[in-house]
Amino acid sequence: MFRAMMKLLNRTAAQVPTRKGSGGWRKPVDSPHMTLVGAYGSPYSIKMRAVLRYRRIPHRWVVRNSSEDQGFPEAPVPIIPVLVFHDGENGYSESMVDSSPQIMRLETDYSERSLLPTDPVVRFLDHLVEDYGDEWLTKVMYHYRWHHLYGEAIAKAGNMLPLMSDNQMDAEQHRAINEFITDRQMGRTALVGSTDLNRDVIEGSFVRLLTLLEDHLSQHQFLLGGRPARGDFGLFGQFSQLFFWEPDSSLIAAKCSPRSMIWAYQIDDLSSFEVDETKDWFTRDGLPSTLSALLCEIGRTYAPFLIANERALTAQESELICSIEGNEYRQTPFPYQLKCLNWIREAFGQLHEGDRKAVEQLLDGTGCELLLADPHG
């Protein structure tokens, strides 16, 4: 029973999947190029599945801990999704984790239907939007799934998550795992910032985002113009849970931004979308005010969080504290978010001088300009 409970921990936003052995299924010669191992309740898994669909990369979708989840090479760290690359024969060459590096690896291996805007300035903004989706919106997703005030959402997640890998699970086992995973995930809410103190910040950011997206999507098909980019999939991953799974947040979304909900359904499978070169990404000189509004939202929420997280980790403090929209925000600092901040700075530093100046001008006054400052300068 305990082993079964432990296997179910990976099917949430903060999953820690168990590792499978080396035996079992072997790839047929004529199978797809790669296998994506993930879970329906994992926003990053659904994000990567949508990326593979849009890019029309032949792949196999396998649910973690299902009967098909056998024989894959050990991932670098025990998280999902895992992207397993086939070796062209009857086995595998490697596996990798973390959705953003996975996307960039695919950009190296496949040139068609790229997600990288051609304008390096817009490409940097896309990086920023994807990171916001991955690292800030995940707090919103976790909040609407596990915060103690959302009883229906908790009950739904507790009932459905255990069945993802085995829909024929017996009732006694299902009940025990339901209780185990619910208790564990509710106990982790404070670690990701979902507390009573932070509730107004998290929920306010969700409503503001929906409102500005309703305006943007009334004029533009994607976040950065006429074709999708990384940022579209970064937001979609979290929206796949907030819109399609969580009862409370889905009602809020339907009320505040029906266009966002339809957009998310579209992003889930863009395999039929034909790229029109005449409807490309925005350029630095043609960014609409609706995109500036999104950057301002990132600047008022995610940017102060990242800076406070960096300061807390540098000072070896057990709690980060910052002000977001006039409200005090507190949570445990996380080293991974410091890596995210450093990656943003590295991407900015790799731009040519003229492009850096263009980024600085575009971000001036949004709040995001704080992320570009050299902490040692």
Task: Annotate each PLM feature.
Residues 2-19:
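Intrinsically disordered, low-structural-confidence terminal and linker regions
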